[in-house]
Amino acid sequence: MKKKIKKHLPLKRFSQNFLINQNLIKKIVKFINPQLKQTLVEIGPGLGALTKPICNIVDELIVIEIDLNLLNFLKKYSFYSKLIVFCQDALIFDYLNLFYKKNKLIRIFGNLPYHISTSLLFCFFEKNKIIQDMNFMLQKEVAERLIAFPGTKSYGRLSIIAQYYCNIKIIFNVASENFRPIPKIDSTFVNLVPHKKSPYFTHDIKVLSYITNLAFQKRRKILRHSLGKIFSEKIFLKLNVDPKLRAENLSILQYCQLSNYIIENDILKNKNFN
């Protein structure tokens, strides 16, 4: 793998850090447990660390890679014939069209580029109905945010939306020295499985997303100030929410209650949440 890296200059703008530890690669492939006939999608195959061993198991693998140089690099390997290649940004790929073509739930995995990992997660959450599971290598800090509880430093909008949509498990942490070039931060391998039915009820997830975004834009402000234009102190108290609390102190259930109150009482009825 180190020899491969020397042949390809990693691009900072694409957050290219390649996993080189073969034991970890085997561990990841074993956990993903790819099967024949599944719709498997790899985000950013890179130098083929996961691509090759997975292609040894399956007959077809869909890969999305924005760097044409990397795709040209992979062409020299025999497993390339098993790949269905899309040279484009994973954020704008048409996953819904893929689902309709294959008529199967999609399994997505990969070492997500650091600079767009959060954006990609939100993108996939919105498509939860067509996804079977997701297995990603993420920045450790992002992984901690995914599973964070109210009242903790890591808890935020990502925690709320992620837990609304998915059951999330931290599988293992990966030290930075297992990548080339060596990043400044450690990583974590995470498994996300969309809920068949969310444990949290909201009339409209877009409203929940809106108010959590509003609340956490200035997370140190108390709710009376961050959400005061929507909820009066009287309404907060009616919903058993202390207006003196900060955004990080409210549970997912409480945010759902706030979003449902907006819908049920036609608050912000002229607001476009798209």
UniProtKB/Swiss-Prot annotation:
PROSITE patterns: RRNA_A_DIMETH (PS01131), SAM_RNA_A_N6_MT (PS51689). It comes from the Bacteria. It catalyses: adenosine(1518)/adenosine(1519) in 16S rRNA + 4 S-adenosyl-L-methionine = N(6)-dimethyladenosine(1518)/N(6)-dimethyladenosine(1519) in 16S rRNA + 4 S-adenosyl-L-homocysteine + 4 H(+). Its main location: cytoplasm. GO terms for cellular component: cytosol. Its EC number is 2.1.1.182. NCBIfam families: ksgA. This is Ribosomal RNA small subunit methyltransferase A. It comes from Buchnera aphidicola subsp. Schizaphis graminum (strain Sg).
